Amino acid sequence: MVNVPKTRKTYCKGKACRKHTQHKVTQYKAGKASLFAQGKRRYDRKQSGFGGQTKQIFRKKAKTTKKVVLRLECLSCKTKAQLPLKRCKHFELGGEKKQKGQALQF
């Protein structure tokens, strides 16, 4: 279980700052895939018409988790940076801090 606070003071690479400032932390999420990317256009063109499936569909998935990527936004200059974490099954953003002698809850 990884619990990350919603704000963190860390170095900002923005041209305005270049020092340690307060950052807002959010979890990175992949955007919607574009229909007009070259690979997608090529794939759709190849798939159209007769002949069934033309490229392999990947089925041998090996990983059970994804790496968590944090998106840090500087509160003074709005510069955004990304910070990858290690793999984890449970990720929490701004959850309650652990108390001593308490049982784990999911």
Curated annotation (Swiss-Prot):
It holds the Pfam family Ribosomal_L44. GO terms for cellular component: cytosolic large ribosomal subunit. One of its GO terms (molecular function) is structural constituent of ribosome. Keywords: Ribonucleoprotein, Ribosomal protein. One of its GO terms (biological process) is translation. The keyword Lipid metabolism does not apply. PANTHER family: 60S RIBOSOMAL PROTEIN L36A/L44. Belongs to the eukaryotic ribosomal protein eL42 family. This is Large ribosomal subunit protein eL42. It comes from Eremothecium gossypii (strain ATCC 10895 / CBS 109.51 / FGSC 9923 / NRRL Y-1056) (Yeast).
